[in-house]
């Protein structure tokens, strides 16, 4: 292998071969030169020569990527460009940007240039962040408070006098919807504005509709309560003689006891015209059956007081204490046909 074609260019003081012993060629000041690169070096020296021999080639291992912050810290002030630094200081950057923009810039301690890196942002917020909480414009809080006060403000309620209410009620009795001319005339008489009069009529119409609905509900309830009110029904307490004379003790065992009138005045089932073959208890006892019962009994069911020409009226002479009832009480177990039915 030809050593003349193995290595790229190198920088040396003078052309001259040297022994390929793995040692570095001496530099210009007698110090060892830099390690040979696999890529072409920039032309810095006056002479360019080739390495007469090549050592063992090693694979190129790229360095791991660094974050921008570390890269900027390692870079330092930066390369020179036309006699000045490429990275500007914070003061120069602020001066240039303030000329380009019309709005105020942030304080200097809030931002750092590329030379400082983002290390300033890792510390305490400092006074610069506190300045961000200041209002953008001094008049903004005042306008917000003014709008808040307007929303809280309520209009004053109009207090009408007695004369004003009388005049308004007179017109309302005539018409519920007065026209503009009537409202203006009423406003002149009552010393009010037309808008106040219009609002009063709106509220008065709403109150009137509410009362109408409530009145209809009450009218619908009154006939029902009047027709079915138990307190106004007639009571049979006005006939104590009938109850005392026809009431039998429960322990007497009389067959006619359950069929007689109860103390509450409500007839038992056997009092109906169809519960006995003789038609009624009175007919069974020999008393002529009345054509109609007492009106107090049938008034609960809505029947008319009289169904015929005669009405049942108990006598005060004690006619029901006849020998037939006495015989029934004395001989309850004897058949009815053997009893003496004398009146």
Curated annotation (Swiss-Prot):
Keyword DNA-binding: yes
Cross-referenced SMART domains: HOX
GO biological process, one term: regulation of transcription by RNA polymerase II
DNA-binding region: 153-212
Function: Transcriptional regulator with a possible role in patterning of mesoderm during development.
Cross-referenced Pfam families: Homeodomain (PF00046)
Gene3D superfamilies: Homeodomain-like (1.10.10.60)
Subcellular compartments: Nucleus
Major site of localization recorded for this protein: nucleus
Entry keyword set: Developmental protein, Disease variant, DNA-binding, Homeobox, Nucleus, Transcription, Transcription regulation
Gene Ontology cellular component annotations, sorted alphabetically: chromatin; nucleus
The organism's taxonomic lineage, starting at the top: Eukaryota, Metazoa, Chordata, Craniata, Vertebrata
Cited InterPro entries: HD, Homeobox_CS, Homeodomain-like_sf, Paired_Homeobox_TFs
Annotated gene: ALX3
Record keyword DNA-binding present: yes
Region (Disordered): 1-104
One example GO MF annotation: RNA polymerase II transcription regulatory region sequence-specific DNA binding
Family: Belongs to the paired homeobox family.
PANTHER family: HOMEOBOX PROTEIN ARISTALESS, HOMEOBOX PROTEIN ARISTALESS-LIKE 3
Name of this protein: Homeobox protein aristaless-like 3
């Amino acid at each position: 292998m030809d050593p003349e074609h193995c290595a790229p260019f190198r920088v040396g003081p003078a052309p001259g071969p040297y022994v390929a012993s793995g040692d570095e060629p001496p530099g210009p000041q007698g110090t060892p030169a830099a390690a040979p690169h696999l890529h072409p070096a920039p032309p810095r020296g006056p002479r360019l020569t080739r390495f007469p021999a090549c050592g063992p080639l090693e694979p190129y291992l790229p360095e791991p990527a660094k974050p921008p912050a570390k890269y900027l810290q390692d870079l330092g002030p930066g390369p020179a460009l036309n006699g000045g630094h490429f990275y500007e200081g914070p003061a120069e950057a602020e001066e240039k940007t303030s000329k380009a923009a019309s709005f105020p810039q942030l304080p200097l301690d809030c931002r750092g240039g590329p030379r400082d890196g983002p290390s300033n942002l890792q510390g305490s917020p400092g006074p610069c962040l506190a300045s961000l909480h200041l209002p953008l414009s001094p008049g903004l809080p005042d306008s917000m408070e003014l709008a808040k006060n307007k929303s809280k403000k309520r209009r004053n309620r109009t207090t009408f006098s007695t004369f004003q209410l009388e005049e308004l009620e007179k017109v309302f009795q005539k018409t519920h919807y007065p026209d503009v001319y009537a409202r203006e005339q009423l406003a002149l008489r009552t010393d009010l504005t037309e808008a106040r009069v219009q609002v009063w009529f709106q509220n008065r119409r709403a109150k009137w509709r509410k009362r109408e609905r409530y009145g209809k509900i009450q009218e619908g309830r009154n006939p029902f309560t009047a027709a079915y009110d138990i307190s106004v029904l007639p009571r049979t307490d006005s006939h104590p003689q009938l109850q005392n004379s026809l009431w039998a003790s429960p322990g007497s065992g009389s067959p006619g006891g359950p069929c007689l009138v109860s103390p509450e005045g409500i007839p038992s089932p056997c009092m109906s015209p169809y519960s006995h073959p003789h038609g009624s208890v009175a007919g069974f006892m020999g008393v002529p059956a009345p054509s109609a019962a007492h009106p107090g009994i049938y008034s609960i069911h809505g029947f008319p007081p009289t169904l015929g020409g005669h009405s049942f009226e108990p006598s005060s002479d004690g006619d029901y204490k006849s020998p037939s009832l006495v015989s029934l009480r004395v001989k309850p177990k004897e058949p009815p046909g053997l009893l003496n039915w004398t009146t």
